[in-house]
C-alpha cells in the first residue's frame, strides 16, 4: 500500500490494491463503480508505516490550505476543498457508513421528488382556490343585483298598495253615499205609503172605465144585488158560448209603462165546476170575471195586486153560483181591504210597484209554508218507514217459524220412512223364519227347555217396558208394540221347533263339531233373561239404519265355514230379538274353524254392536 501511494501527489485521491482484495466480499453501493470498492478487514503487516504516511498527508494538506487561505482566492479554496474531499478514500469508511450514505442519497432523491409533487399540488390547490374565490365574487355580485331588483319590486308593490288603498277608500265613499241615498229614498217611499194607506173618500170612489165596466157604487151603503138574476144568467151563457176565447185584462195608461198586459186563456167544463187555468198564476180568471160581471165589487186580492191568495174568492163564480144569494156572499167574502196586509184595494191598484217588497215577503211566507208541509211529509214518511220495518221484522219471525216447522216435518217424514222400511224387513224375516236348532248336548231342544227361557225373556222385556216412562214421541211407542208382537212370533217359532223333533234326530252326529265351534265362537255370552232397558231401546233406534252395513262387514270379514254348522239356541233367541230380515244361513256363516285372533276380536266387537 505504501508502494502504491508513492508516485501520486499528496493531495490527490487514489485507490490502493492489496493481494487480499480478491479474497474479500464485494459490497454493492448504488451510484458508485465497483472498481476499487473493496476493503480488507485483515490487519496490515506494518501499521506504523501506514500511520506515518497518513500523518504526512494530513500535514501536507494543512500546509496547502493555509497557503490558499493566505492568498484569499475563494475559487482556489473551493477547488482545493474538492481536491481534499477527493483525496479522502471510500475505502476508509466501513460498511455501515456506506449504507448510511446510500440511504441519505435515497432520501435526498425521495425528498426532491416529494418536493416536486408538493409544489405541483400546491399549484393546483392555489388555482382551485382562486377559481372558488372568483365564483364567490360572482355569486356576491349576483346577490347584490337580485337584492336591488327585490328592492325595486318592493317599492313598486308599496306604490301599488297605496293606489289600491286610495281606490278602496273612494269606492267605500261611493258606497256610503249610495246607501245614504237609498235610505233617504226608502224613507220617502215609506212616508208616501203611509200617506196613501190613510182612508180617503176620493180614492174609494174609483172610476171603472179602464176595466170596461160601469162606475162602481159604494159597497158599504148599498147591499142590494148589482144585477138581477137574469143578467147574471145571461152573462154565464155568454161565458158558455165563448169558453175558449181569450180574456184580456185592460190596464190604465199610467200602468202600461210599468207593467205589460197579460193575456190568459181558460177553459170551462161546466158552470158548476171549477176553472182549469192554463196560466202560471192560479185563480186569476175568476177575479177578472167577477170584475166584469159585478162592477160594484172591489177588486180581489189575488195575484193581480196584493199577492195573497184567498181561497174563498178563487172559485167563487163557479162553485158558489146561486142567483138568489149572490150579493150576501159578495158582501161576506170581499171586504174593502186585504185581510192579510190591511191595505185598501184602491191604493194597491194605483201603486203596484210600491208593494213589490211585500210580495217578496208573501213569497217567503209561502216558501215557509211549503217547507213546513215538506217537514210534515218527511215525518209521515219516517213513521211509515218505522211501521214497514216492524212489519218486516214480523214477517221475518214468521218465516223463521215456518222454516222450523218445515225442518221438523222433514225429520218426521224421514223417521216414518225408516219405520216403514223396518216393517217391510220384519215381514221378510217372518217369511224366512229359521229352521229348528240342536242343543249343545246333542238332544233336540224341546218346549220344556225353550219355554222357560223365552218366558223369562218376555217377562224381562215386559218389566223393562213398564219401567220406561211415557215419552211424547210416538215412534218409541210403535217400537214397543213391534217388540211385543215379535215375542208372540218367537213363541210360535218355539212350538214349531218342538213339532219338528223327529226330523232333526239324524243330525246328532254333528253335535261334536258344533261344540268345538261354539267353544271358539266370538258370539256374546249374554243370556236371554237380561231385561231390556230404555237406553237399549234408544240405541236400537239409533243403530237401525246402520244394521245392514254392519252385517255386510261381518260377512265380508268372517271366513267361509261349514254350511251345516248350527248355532247355540240362546244365540238364536238373541238374533230373533234383533228383528233381522236376513236368512239363517247368511247369519251363521260367521262361525269358522280357521280364524286369526284379530279377526275374532273384530267379529266380537261387531256382533256386540249388532246385538245391542
Swiss-Prot record:
One protein family per Pfam: KIAA1328
Modified residues (Phosphoserine): 20, 178, 471, 527, 558
Sections of the chain in a coiled coil: 90-166, 362-406
InterPro entries found in the cross-reference section: Hinderin (IPR032736)
Region (Disordered): 462-484, 509-598
UniProt subunit comment: Interacts (via N- and C-terminal domains) with SMC3 (via central hinge region).
Protein name: Protein hinderin
Gene: Kiaa1328
